């Protein structure tokens, strides 16, 4: 077999990289344009639009690495703000599973949302039961603190949170991403009452569930938040200090 010298190989590799970069950039531009159009759509509720400035949807999608054509999950979607963002991010060739436990389902809101979005499937059970497997990415925003601290009749705790995260790990394809956003809590505060979580606690349970924490973002950081108020307090609502992790399933 003839050998290829480095003098021959390096220009070929450079050419391939130079061709790939404009294609990737064009795809990114198309996704951003699609997101901006969806966020500004007349049919989108005003209350959803009002959240955009503080939640930074485009920056979040880019940080998590969600791509056109991906299959993704909005885990514990509540009213579906992130479901709509992810729907636009993956485009018509992608799919979004919008998961809510039964007690969180807002049927009228959910029906209206899914009627507008053609690539969304509602899930009211576990991801495994719904057949959501080998997905590219899962996003759960402002939920992990409740799993950890306990909610309704769920006691919470580290073990329960690791089990929850392991169920997400199982639904992801090898190399898939879990995006986590939550309100920052600090030691010495009643974070259960405040609906907050210490970032290190989130790191610990993610690692114990098998994930690698690939990156952290400060795009949702708010230094004016002193972490002592409940997240719905008018003085901090929509302006809480939040952590954002991109965790990856190895493979």
Regions found by a protein language model. Give the residues of each.
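Class I SAM-dependent methyltransferase Rossmann-like catalytic core
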Residues: 31-63, 67
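Conserved class I S-adenosyl-L-methionine
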Residues: 68-78, 105-107, 152, 176-203
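Short glycine-dipeptide loop
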Residues: 68-69, 92-93, 172-178
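A short glycine-rich, Lys/Arg-flanked "PGG" loop and its adjoining helix->strand segment in the class I
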Residues: 87-88, 155-174
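S-adenosyl-L-methionine
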Residues: 105-132
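A short acidic, Gly/Pro-enriched loop at the edge of an enzyme's catalytic core
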Residues: 128-138, 142
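Core SAM-dependent methyltransferase catalytic element
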Residues: 209, 226-251
């Amino acid at each position: 077999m003839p050998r290829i010298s480095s003098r021959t190989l390096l220009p070929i590799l450079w050419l391939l990289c130079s061709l790939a970069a404009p294609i990737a950039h064009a795809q990114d531009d198309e996704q951003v344009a699609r997101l901006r159009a969806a966020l500004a759509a007349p049919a989108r509720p005003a209350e959803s639009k009002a959240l955009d400035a503080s939640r930074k949807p485009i920056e979040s999608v880019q940080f998590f690495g969600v791509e056109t054509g991906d299959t993704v999950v909005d885990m514990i979607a509540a009213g579906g703000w992130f479901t709509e963002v992810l729907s636009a991010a993956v485009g018509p060739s992608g799919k979004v599973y919008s998961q809510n436990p039964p007690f969180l389902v807002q049927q009228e809101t959910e029906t209206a949302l899914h009627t507008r979005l053609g690539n969304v499937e509602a899930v009211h059970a576990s991801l495994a039961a719904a057949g959501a497997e080998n997905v590219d990415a899962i996003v759960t925003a402002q939920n992990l603190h409740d799993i950890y601290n306990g909610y309704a009749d769920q006691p919470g705790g580290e073990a329960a949170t690791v089990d929850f995260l392991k169920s997400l790990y199982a639904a992801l394809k090898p190399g898939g991403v879990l995006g986590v956003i939550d309100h920052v809590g600090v030691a010495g505060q009643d974070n259960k009452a405040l609906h907050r979580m210490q970032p290190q606690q989130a790191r610990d349970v993610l690692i114990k569930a098998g994930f690698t924490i690939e990156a952290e973002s400060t795009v949702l950081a708010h230094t004016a938040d002193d972490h002592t108020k409940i997240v719905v307090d008018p003085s901090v609502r929509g302006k809480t200090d939040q952590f954002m992790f991109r965790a990856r399933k190895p493979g």
